Amino acid sequence: NNKDMALKIKDECVNNGVEAITVQADVSSDDDCKNLVQETINAFGKVDILVNNAGTTKFADHSKLDKLNDEDFINIYKVNVIGPYQMIRAVEPIMKENGFGSVVNISSIAGKTGIGSSIAYAASKGALNTMTLSLAKALGPEIRVNTVCPGFIGTGWFENRFGKETFDRIKKDQENITPLNKAGTPDDIADSAVFFCLEGAEHITGETLISDAGMHLN
């Protein structure tokens, strides 16, 4: 939902010789999902790869159940679960027609371990992981569906949410407690997503790849 950042990244792509477009969409809206796919087809003629990277959450102490209500769950699931489903449904016809498609869902270790910003968030990511399995079975052989589960990722959003001091402390903690002594970066997750789209991953579907410097082992 950061228009300025999207335009900045588009400019970086264009400056590096890559064709790029920006389309604003709310993935919880089925009409927006369909329009996003159609705009992509209009620009490039096809869709080979879909990365479902939109997400939302609410921060709530797991031990305080009254901090979440039904609306919180619905709002989180609309973006984190229904959104990816609607995007995949929108690209299915063109991918099937072309005989090829790779879908990468960006989930979280919250969906594997139960940790995270809230129980609703962790539950939504667990649902996304399970949906990956179901869709991998349903959409083959033309379309492969896989998932990347990041741990802590140092992003501007995270820093803006907590402030630089808290952000730096959390990042340092990650560097100290993870087996690889590393805090994750957006590039780490991008590399994992790209892997699933390369020729070397053509034999892989329904897989969940944890990319968290070993954080889930603690």
Ranges and model annotations:
Residues S108:
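Residue(s) in the substrate-gating loop at a strand-loop-helix junction
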Residues T57, H62, T113, N176, ...:
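Short C-terminal tail/terminal secondary-structure segment
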Residues K3, Q24-L36, D70, D188:
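The beta1-alpha1 cofactor-binding region of Rossmann-like NAD(H)/NADP(H)-dependent oxidoreductases
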Residues P93, A136-P141, E202:
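Alpha-helical segment proximal to the catalytic Tyr-Lys
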Residues C149-N160:
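Short, flexible catalytic-loop segment of classical short-chain dehydrogenase/reductase
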Residues I88, S124:
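Active-site helix of classical SDR
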